[in-house]
Amino acid sequence: MSTTAQIGVTGLAVMGRNLARNFARNGYTVAVHNRTASRTHALVEEFGGEGDFVATETAKEFVAALERPRRLVIMVKAGDPTDAVIREFAPLLEPGDMIIDGGNAHFADTRRRERELREQGIHFVGTGISGGEEGALNGPSIMPGGSKESYASLGPMLEKISAKAADEAPCVTHVGADGAGHFVKMVHNGIEYADMQLIGEAYQLLRDVAGYTPAQIADIFRTWNTGRLDSYLIEITAEVLSHVDAETGKPFVDVVVDQAEQKGTGRWTVQIALDLGVPVSGIAEAVFARSLSGHAALRDASRGLAGPTATPLGESEAAAFADRVEQALYASKIVSYTQGFHEVAAGSEEYGWDIDLGAVSAIWRGGCIIRAAFLDRIRAAYDARPDLPSLLSDETFAQEIAAAQDDWREVLIAATRQGVPTPGFAAALAYYDALRAERLPAALTQGQRDYFGAHTYRRTDRDGTFHTLWGGDRSEVTA
């Protein structure tokens, strides 16, 4: 087979198929391959008019169809399936060729694969892709890792197929070496979990405390989407809440089983944050909320537990409460992104990636699930101060939270009185209050640790590490 294709895509499920079409629509000749050849030929037959495809049935045909240096995109399930594809194709490649993994791989696997393939002279580019099947087709946010050399070759193609922000900037940048791209995509998904949880809590408050119907709440979200909460997730929330089930005539949200599933990237975000010592409490609560929702038997057994008598607000009070919920949602959102960017910064430092946080926020402005007008503000904050220790240290965000905090607290009081669970809002406020506190009970915790385990402590008034002889005369000794 002649060498004709500028890029190849193997793994033609929805994401792979749409990504291949995106490349073809943008003028590239695309070699396509799938484990089952029928899917390959079906793609070319159905979408061949969109651009130039080269259908291949075997690994050798696929590799032979690619121009040198070869660019091979893997779009298969993370884990063992990805390793299996690499084992199949790597022996057919030459030094200078590159394998691009566009799946949701764990960044540690990406680091391993990059190291192993580098020894063969093959570039491995772990690439986070966000936007779902629509984004893959029409322009996703793309987070490539790997070497700078590989990005010099691949970058122009990714820039062409990526989403474009409002200022027409492509939503792609070289994030950092080896696993940086998949690490940033992981944290993106963690923030997505937190965003969705906060939106869900806002919905529950508007329904159970304010007494609004799903259709009325949809209108409230549409109004919010014209302001500072303008985002893809707020937009689709209004669409979901306004949808009516054709079979029953009930609001769609009332006929969906209230058990939220998850694929694992949110859980990874929390696990890695624990390893790095980074508090991502909002993301953690979002993950735990999904887990709790799935324990149907436990929830059924607990429905008879005592709780407050719920009394929805009157119509005149409901509108004011909705405004307070908007404040609480926005303030909590700031905290969620603060925690997410803290984890990215910590990962960058731990693994030597030198990630530009402003650039990350810039490529999340379009194409991805968490795209929001709010990200322009984050980019501006990091561009002005690349060493910004926290988004809460930015003057603008600090002022906005200061203006929102009274309403934020009132919303949580109302939720507690009515028995509405708001773990995301509560975790965000607790994080904010902990950061601004003059003293934390951690001093007592450290004293307890010293008492039962001789774990020592540091003093506020002099340097050194100390231990109290709790079982003796309680004198203090230098550790």
Model-derived features with residue positions:
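NAD(P)+-binding Rossmann beta1-loop-alpha1 motif at the extreme N-terminus of oxidoreductases
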Residues: M1-A64, R70, G96, E133-A136
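Glycine-rich, highly charged phosphate/nucleotide-binding loops
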Residues: V54-E61, A78-I86
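Rossmann-fold dinucleotide-binding core
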Residues: T82-R87, I100, H106-A218, T226-P251, ...
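Interdomain hinge/lid region at the active-site interface
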Residues: H182, R207, Y212, D219, ...
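Small-residue-rich helix-loop
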Residues: T223, S348-A381
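C-terminal amphipathic alpha-helical interaction region
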Residues: A402-A403, D407-A479
